């Protein structure tokens, strides 16, 4: 009766020892990764600026800053997709002249100018406040002040 138990135990032990000797350890390898993204639907320039500010808040939890991946235009509004990318340790701050109107033609240009103004104001201990205007000829301008 004892030999009936010993034989299966011996075979199992031998199998485990051989498997341990012949196999090498493999660690999982990352084959793809992506940064967190957030998408906002908006109508108009003021909502785009608010979507950008919301993306800043969202990306802060990852110690990152938003980068515009794409802006899609549709019949029912526009959609902006932001990717959270690691914040640079050294940032070049472009000089923004407060209360000077900056013309822009595209949503991307508006976001770029807005981010530059925010960096400038933050470097000077404030926060950027934007005012968007559209002239009768359709020219769009944004003016910043630091508060």
Residue ranges and their predicted role:
Residues 1-11:
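Bacterial N-terminal signal peptides that target proteins for export
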Residues 17-20:
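C-terminal motif of bacterial Sec signal peptides marking the signal peptidase cleavage site
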């Amino acid at each position: 009766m004892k030999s009936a138990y010993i034989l299966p135990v011996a075979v199992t032990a031998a199998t485990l020892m051989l498997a341990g000797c012949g196999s090498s350890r493999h660690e999982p390898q990352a084959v793809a990764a992506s940064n967190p993204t957030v998408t906002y639907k908006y109508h108009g320039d003021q909502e785009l600026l608010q979507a950008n500010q919301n993306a800043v808040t969202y990306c802060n939890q990852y110690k990152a800053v938003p980068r515009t991946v794409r802006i899609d235009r549709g019949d029912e509004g526009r959609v902006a997709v932001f990717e959270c990318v690691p914040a640079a340790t050294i940032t070049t701050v472009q000089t923004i002249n407060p209360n000077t109107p900056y013309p822009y033609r595209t949503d991307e240009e508006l976001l770029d100018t807005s981010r530059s103004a925010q960096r400038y104001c933050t470097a000077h201990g404030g926060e950027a406040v934007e005012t968007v205007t559209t002239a009768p000829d359709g020219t769009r301008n944004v003016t910043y002040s630091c508060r």
